[in-house]
Design a protein with these regions (language model features):
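Active-site-adjacent beta-strand/loop module that shapes the phosphate/pyrophosphate-binding cleft
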Residues: 85-113
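Nudix hydrolase/Nudix homology domain
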Residues: 114-159
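Conserved hydrophobic "DFG−1" position in protein kinase catalytic cores
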Residues: 29-30, 37, 107, 126
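A short coil-to-beta-strand element that immediately follows conserved catalytic motifs
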Residues: 1, 77-86
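A short Gly-Trp-Pro
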Residues: 31, 52-58, 104-106, 143-144, ...
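Acidic, metal-coordinating catalytic segment for phosphate/diphosphate chemistry
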Residues: 1-27
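A generic structural micro-feature
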Residues: 19-21, 48, 95-101, 116-121
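Conserved Nudix-box catalytic region and its N-terminal flanking loop in Nudix hydrolases
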Residues: 30-72
């Protein structure tokens, strides 16, 4: 195979393969004026903060995939998903670099729901949504999504 950027070409048969980004979605979940954040249980970023979410499966919309991931990781269903931001990300998994396009939504969870960390989430933590240190997030894209969340909350009068 001969590589030309993100395109692989076979000089023998002419087959062409394009390496595209993977889609991922994450949610900033607000519950009773607190932000629910996950602690990553696996690499990349093990032990760092993250939002519930993950890769979108074939034939899923961003919203469907995100709702599935939240259920898998925290065992809860959430309210309406409101778009916040998107950002490119570099995701190094098992030594293989993946380029992803990460989209972030804002949503709510009932204060009565029981959060159960599962899948690749080792724990969850509750934060004042305006007082999270962005450097504690595992990924730069999540930091960018968080800053957009803070801007939207301040615009709404949160202090």
């Amino acid at each position: 195979m001969i590589s030309a950027g993100r395109e692989l070409n076979c000089p023998h048969c002419g087959f062409r393969f394009f390496i595209n980004t993977a889609a991922a979605a994450g949610a900033f979940v607000l519950r009773d004026r607190q932000l629910v954040l996950c602690v990553r249980g696996k690499d990349p970023g093990r032990g760092k903060l993250d939002v519930p979410g993950g890769f979108i499966e074939f034939n899923e919309s961003l919203e469907e995939g995100l709702r599935r991931e939240i259920l898998e990781e925290l065992g809860i269903e959430v309210g309406e998903l409101s778009y916040l931001a998107s950002a490119p990300n570099d995701y190094l998994f098992a030594g293989v670099p993946y380029k992803t396009s990460d989209v972030f939504f804002r949503t709510t969870a009932s204060p009565d729901v029981v959060l159960v960390p599962q899948d690749d989430v080792s724990a969850y933590q509750l934060f004042d949504p305006l007082r999270v240190n962005p450097s504690d997030f595992a990924f730069e894209s999540t930091r960018q999504g968080y800053l957009r969340l803070v801007m939207s909350l301040v615009e709404e009068g949160w202090t």
